[in-house]
């Protein structure tokens, strides 16, 4: 391979449409690549010029742009290059034989001229903010049913305890404030969440793969239809309260719709499809901010209805209406973020699973780091810059991120019992219990919209100062962040800026930029877990209303960890795997939701026997401590320098 050829050969990354994928390589400032169009070089589709990189099968070169001059067969069998971490040259190495290499370049199905990049440009120009109204509606509807569901169960169990008709009791009747009734409510509520999450575990993975093939809109429409049916059943139950276990049918309907995880994962996939790499964490943060805003307003309204109106079923009328609005928005307004014109082979993959169990486990394959290297080719479905060696080192960030997200949900299980805890220990009613949940969600929204981007910008500046002596940040593409006030401006610009501006569509990511993004998110996550641990301890020792509200506000600041961890993981995979990664995360979330209800119900019941109901918060503190330790094992995307 000639030196001239080395200087201009495009950097290639593995792609599912390529039979023998190339090695992922460190991009250099002179040769940036289109990560979504692996066979397009800088100066071609990335810059608007539609010339393809084709090698003629007879060994001669037909490119008049000096893109790829073919060399003889003997040059491919030259002495292998030596890799060394002290050299600054960035020469790409192909492990493919000439014939197979030519076949890759001649495969027009991979990227027919600039058609591939044109499609990526189209969906990157979609604004991730289009999903925010749906995220709000989803969270608002889920938030509204939490307080009514708890007090509906409390009313029905209290009627059984006193052998009364449920209609003779008000939802917040003081005679129902007994330890055995409170623990009974926690058990039924745990069964509700576990059943829905268990069914969601099997449906979420299937919906995730379906979303990558048929598009996000179809998945959202199907899943929300099941959620609507679940709320209609709760509406019937609130009209005529029966046995508390009748509400489990609503849990089954919601589970068939993927429960909470599928809708959230599909919404996050839309954000990942349409957002640029360096803005992805902030857009995911805005997504979570909209979610927390909905969970803030929902409990407040439902708590007011339960406490000050005689009819609890008003709540479920409202939630059913909002789900209908959600469906209309998806049908009439939301654009599709993916090109759904996939091959029949891929479409058969989603319909030809031998079992539901296999469909559940299929997306989890993306979490396992795979590196298969031979003398001819290397295949990476996950990649990092460190892994560009003959040996091919695995990187575990995606799997660790899935574990962290599931543990974070598990640690948050104590917040679900907070209304029961405050009702029993402090004598709060539905309205006050809903206010503390709303406070948590409002504080989370402010954190993710304002505090998180500013903190990220400060940490990014610190990283630049600490590591500038190593030359990691001397890249011209970073010149757009010259002012220290840019972080403040970004708070507002993130609200209106689309995921990709036309001027920067498909600009390649350099090693310096990726290193900065990942290390910044790692530091944010470490800080968030430390705050979560402290807040859980404060909740456990709180003796007054003021102390409880203060601890909840501090705990809300830690909610930035989820978008940070997701951003770390998504920066470690190719963009075409975003949907599968988030679907795999949703499976882990479903597992956490399955087990956290019974775990916290058991701990709460046992601690009530010894008059220590605050043990649930100490359990959360232990879980957050484990997360704080795990985050230190996540690897960074450091540049790998080579010499010939």
Swiss-Prot record:
This is Uncharacterized membrane protein C14C4.07. Residues 83-106 have a biased composition (Polar residues). GO terms for molecular function: transmembrane transporter activity. GO terms for biological process: transmembrane transport. Residues 1-35, 48-106 are annotated as: Disordered. GO terms for cellular component: fungal-type vacuole membrane; Golgi apparatus; membrane. It holds the Pfam family MFS_1. It is a multi-pass membrane protein. Gene3D superfamilies: MFS general substrate transporter like domains. The modification Phosphoserine is found at residue 28. Residues 58-70 have a biased composition (Low complexity). Keywords: Membrane, Phosphoprotein, Transmembrane, Transmembrane helix. The lineage of its organism: Eukaryota, Fungi, Dikarya, Ascomycota, Taphrinomycotina. The chain crosses the membrane at residues 131-151, 190-210, 218-238, 245-265, 286-306, 314-334, 398-418, 435-455, 522-542, 546-566, 583-603, 614-634. It comes from the Eukaryota.
């Amino acid at each position: 391979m000639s030196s001239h050829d080395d200087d201009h050969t495009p950097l290639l990354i593995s792609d599912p449409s390529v039979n023998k994928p190339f090695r992922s390589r460190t991009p250099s400032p002179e040769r940036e690549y289109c990560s979504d169009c692996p066979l397009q070089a800088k100066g071609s589709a990335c810059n608007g010029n539609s010339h393809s990189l084709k090698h003629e099968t007879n060994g001669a070169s037909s490119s008049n742009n000096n893109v790829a001059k073919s060399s003889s067969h003997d040059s491919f069998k030259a002495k292998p290059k030596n890799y060394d971490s002290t050299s600054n040259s960035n020469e790409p190495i192909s492990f493919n034989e000439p014939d197979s290499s030519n076949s890759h370049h001649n495969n027009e199905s991979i990227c027919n001229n600039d058609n591939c990049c044109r499609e990526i440009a189209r969906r990157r120009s979609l604004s991730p903010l289009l999903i925010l109204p749906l995220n709000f509606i989803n969270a608002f509807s889920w938030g509204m049913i939490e307080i009514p569901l708890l007090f509906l169960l409390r009313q029905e169990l209290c009627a059984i305890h006193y052998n009364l008709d449920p209609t003779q009791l008000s939802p917040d009747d003081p005679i129902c404030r007994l330890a055995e009734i409170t623990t009974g409510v926690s058990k039924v509520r745990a069964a509700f969440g576990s059943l829905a999450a268990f069914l969601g575990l099997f449906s979420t993975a299937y919906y995730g793969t379906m979303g990558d093939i048929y598009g996000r809109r179809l998945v959202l429409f199907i899943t929300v239809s099941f959620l609507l049916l679940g709320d209609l059943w709760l509406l019937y139950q609130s009209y005529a309260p029966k046995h508390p276990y009748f509400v489990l049918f609503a849990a089954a309907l919601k589970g068939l719709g993927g429960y909470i995880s599928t809708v959230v994962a599909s919404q996050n996939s839309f954000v990942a499809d349409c957002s640029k790499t360096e803005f992805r964490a902030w857009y995911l943060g805005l997504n979570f901010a909209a979610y927390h805003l909905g969970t803030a307003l929902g409990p407040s309204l439902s708590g007011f209805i339960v406490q000050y109106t005689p009819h609890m079923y008003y709540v479920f009328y409202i939630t059913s209406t909002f789900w209908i609005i959600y469906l209309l928005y998806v049908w009439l307004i939301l654009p599709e973020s993916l090109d759904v014109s996939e091959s029949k082979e891929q479409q058969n993959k989603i319909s030809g699973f031998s079992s539901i169990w296999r469909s559940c486990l299929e997306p989890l394959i993306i979490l396992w780091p795979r590196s298969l290297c031979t003398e001819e080719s290397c295949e990476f479905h996950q990649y990092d810059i460190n892994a560009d060696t003959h040996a091919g080192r695995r990187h575990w960030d995606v799997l660790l991120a899935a574990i962290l997200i599931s543990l974070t949900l598990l640690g948050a299980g104590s917040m679900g019992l907070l209304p029961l805890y405050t009702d029993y220990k402090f004598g709060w009613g539905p309205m006050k219990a809903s206010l503390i949940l709303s406070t948590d969600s409002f504080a989370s929204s402010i954190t993710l919209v304002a505090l998180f981007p500013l903190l990220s910008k400060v940490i990014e500046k610190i990283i630049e100062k600490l590591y500038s002596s190593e030359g990691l940040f001397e890249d011209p593409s970073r010149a757009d962040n010259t002012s220290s006030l840019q972080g403040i401006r970004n708070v507002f610009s993130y609200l209106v800026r689309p995921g990709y501006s036309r001027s920067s569509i498909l600009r390649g990511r350099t090693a310096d930029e990726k290193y900065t993004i990942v290390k910044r998110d790692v530091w944010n996550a470490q800080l968030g877990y430390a705050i979560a641990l402290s807040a859980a301890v404060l909740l456990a020792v709180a003796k007054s209303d003021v102390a409880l509200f203060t601890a909840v506000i501090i705990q809300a600041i830690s909610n930035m960890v989820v978008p940070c961890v997701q951003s770390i993981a998504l920066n470690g995979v190719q963009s075409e795997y975003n949907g599968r990664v988030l679907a795999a995360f949703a499976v882990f979330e479903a597992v956490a939701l399955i087990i956290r209800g019974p775990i916290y119900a058991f701990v709460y019941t046992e601690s009530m026997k010894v008059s220590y109901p605050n043990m649930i918060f100490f359990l959360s503190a232990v879980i957050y401590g484990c997360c704080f330790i795990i985050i230190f094992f996540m690897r960074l995307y450091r540049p790998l320098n080579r010499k010939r």
